[in-house]
Amino acid sequence: MENTRRSFLKKVSAAGIGAAGLAMAGNAGATTTAAEPQKKKTAGKDDGKLRFGFIGTGSRCHEHINNVLAIPGNKIVAICDIQQGPIDSTLKHIAKFNVPAPKVYKGGEREFENMLNNEEFDCVIIASPWEWHVPMSVAAMKAGVPYVGVEVSAANTLEECWDLVNVSEATGSHLNIMENVCYRRDCMAALNMVRQGLFGEILHGGCGYEHDLREVKFNDGTHYNYVPGSGDLRMGPTAFAEAQWRTNHSVHRNGDIYPTHGIGPIAHCMDINRGNRFLSLSAMATQSRGLHKFIVDNGGENHPLAKVNFNLGDIVTSMIKCSNGQTIIVTHDTNSPRPYSLGFRVQGTEGLWMNDGDHVYVQGKSKPHRWDDSDEWFKKYDHKLWASLESQAAEAGHGGMDYIMMYDLIDAIRNKKPAPMDCYDAAAWSAISGLSEMSIARGGALVDFPDFTRGQWIHRQPQFAL
């Protein structure tokens, strides 16, 4: 098992090194035809319960399990991981619900393929390290799983983005990107205000991922976060959880490597892939200082990791132009000391919402040149999903948005509806990573967004959270 884990982590590291090199248009010219999943599966086979599988059994998997089992009519058929520790933790977690234990697939790094080929699922959730999101999603769709939920970001390169689109179209399987921030209560209220015209014609959006992850990117191999004062800083195979693989991206890549928390809600406000699309992007990055400084400050100048050259700029800024004229600024900032923010801004001809400061201004309704507290507006324009599910979501992760997201996906599965956030959303949002890397490598040059819908965006209608 240990050899398998080390082999896996070595491949993760190699994938990180090659990520920027793979950021190319890939299959942009490929065409596919829609088809039904090659394995016909009935939602709620036999006992009427939806059959779920999980690939990757870390902490994010536990959050999803909580919500799958909190919503009536679901069961967990199988789980898969290459490490025994997370498997044991997940089995213990599931046992708290007094439900049958799932079948366990473990051992080799391709064991997930055996799980997909041996079991029948209504949905498989993928919560693995980033490098495995696309291979596992593709395998699940090709195995005929009707709905595949992939954690964020869905893909690391443009080639991978095209893989998700092409395979979803070819197999008929519904790929859903599990972007929980799209279900954040304030984001859904703001979307409601946009759709009701409170902000007028939308002109501009701002968003990002501004989250101090220094204590996540390094730890002592036992604790999820770095233990202050310990001086025990590790990354890679000897570290624990995300520090085993995530920090490697900061070594070998320079771009917005985690864009979807921010861009997802803004994309919905601008009807991206549904009457509008991203046209082009330009990105720039600051110098890389934060991670090295964190190592020296906590481990000393002679710490082995002080010799690591981190490529990721501390702050990466991308500007996107949309076909309907809007602009969007996306910021990635995970290596700096700072409070958490996703920096949302939705601005139109009649007003705007600013997440930082909790501000709303609506022309003709707000006092001139004075901000309103966003709470008073968001209570009035609370989205119906939140209004109806508030009590159920109250105890769920991330303030309840995880529950709302899973509820919406399960509703789609039961009613055989399209995925709430489909393969085109997954590709367009995730493509910011590869495109920003390309742009930065070219000195901030403007790069074109692929049209992952191949022209369908012109006629597609909004479907999210209607």
From Swiss-Prot:
Cofactor annotation comment: Binds 1 NAD(+) per subunit. The NAD(+) cannot dissociate.
GO molecular function: hydrolase activity, acting on glycosyl bonds; nucleotide binding
NCBIfam families on file: TAT_signal_seq (TIGR01409)
UniProt binding sites for substrate: 209, 246, 258-261, 340
InterPro entries: Gfo/Idh/MocA-like_OxRdtase_N, Gfo/Idh/MocA_oxidrdct_glycsds, Glyco_hydro_109_C, NAD(P)-bd_dom_sf, TAT_signal, TAT_signal_bac_arc
Modifications the protein undergoes after translation, according to the UniProt entry: Predicted to be exported by the Tat system. The position of the signal peptide cleavage has not been experimentally proven.
Gene3D superfamilies: Dihydrodipicolinate Reductase, domain 2 (3.30.360.10), NAD(P)-binding Rossmann-like Domain (3.40.50.720)
Enzyme class: hydrolase
Pfam families per record: GFO_IDH_MocA, Glyco_hydro_109_C
Reported cofactor(s): NAD(+)
Family to which the UniProt record says this protein belongs: Belongs to the Gfo/Idh/MocA family. Glycosyl hydrolase 109 subfamily.
Protein name (database record): Glycosyl hydrolase family 109 protein
Keyword annotations: Glycosidase, Hydrolase, NAD, Signal
EC number: 3.2.1.-
Signal sequence annotation: 1-30
Residues noted as binding NAD(+) in the record, renumbered to the chain: 59-60, 81, 130-133, 151-152, 180, 241-245, 258
Described function: Glycosidase.
